[in-house]
Swiss-Prot record:
Residue positions binding substrate: 59, 270, 321
Listed NCBIfam families: thiL (TIGR01379)
Binding locations of Mg(2+) 1: 51-52, 127
Binding site for Mg(2+) 5: 220
Protein name: Thiamine-monophosphate kinase
Organismal lineage: Archaea, Methanobacteriati, Methanobacteriota, Methanomada group, Methanobacteria
Family per similarity comment: Belongs to the thiamine-monophosphate kinase family.
Keyword line: ATP-binding, Kinase, Magnesium, Metal-binding, Nucleotide-binding, Thiamine biosynthesis, Transferase
Species name: Methanothermobacter thermautotrophicus (strain ATCC 29096 / DSM 1053 / JCM 10044 / NBRC 100330 / Delta H)
Gene of this entry: thiL
GO molecular function, one term: thiamine-phosphate kinase activity
Amino acid sequence: MHDRISSLGEKKLISRIISRARSVFGSSEVMGLGDDAALIDAGEEFLVLTSDLLLETRHFPDPERPRDMGWKTVTVNMSDLAAMGSRPEGFILSVALPDLELEFFDSLMDGVIEACCHYQAPLIGGDTNEADEIILSGTAIGRAEKDMVLMKSGARPGDLVAVTGPLGVGAAGTELILSGRDTGGFENAVERSLRPVARIEEGLILAESGLVSSATDITDGLVSELGELMDASGTGMRIYEDRLPLGREVPEIASILGRDPLELALYYGEDFELVFTAPPTGMEELSDMMELHVIGEVTVGGGIEMVDKDGVTYKLHVRGYEHLSPG
């Protein structure tokens, strides 16, 4: 019996691809491979490129809002640029579509163009094809100063760990929409789910400060992304439950849905915030420049630990949103 890709899951499959690429191409040709975006030497700067693929049936909790679908397609790509401290320069969109009504298609494209304008990244090309469902593939292009680019590697024991904003809001909004319940009173959570905003400005502040040792975005879940920083840096992580900035509506929505609010904040994903590390003195300087929430520290090793509200320490299993998984 032959193994299938579901036996690996998305992250191990990506590692398999990276390993095969590195066996052929030199390290100077595959800079950024395995990070949030690829880096191409462009003289005094890096050209930063990233690509994300979204499916109608998997990535959009309300496919009856085409403008929001277009917006989100751009934003998920821009979030990877933000994680690298890159300034957007352009966006390429490839689409595979069923025979949509033109009004629906125009609304979808209005969302794409609106987002491109928001991020100051003009739509510069793409491709079209046919499919049984809506498939949207975006490629974002940016630039970053060579000595300022943010990477997943570089965290050191003693560094502090911080996030740029509240956790669990997008997850709570997504689950509320999928439940079919009344979303009245939870407009912010719904907006965070359907029209997230990439933290481009925050990424630029972090990059230009020169104070950050590692960074990534947390669209696939906080614990999963902490695992990425940990593995890339060869360290461990310790976070504190009472320091996690849960969005104010997360506990109430979780109660309505019978969900654990901590689970939504730690594992679900859909939070378009950044998580980063910096030495204590650097983190203090950064706190004067932008909103941030210190949630823990980098440790010598031993995986990811959580200290709960009673002071009890336990290990967290590194998981989060992942495609190509069994079940």
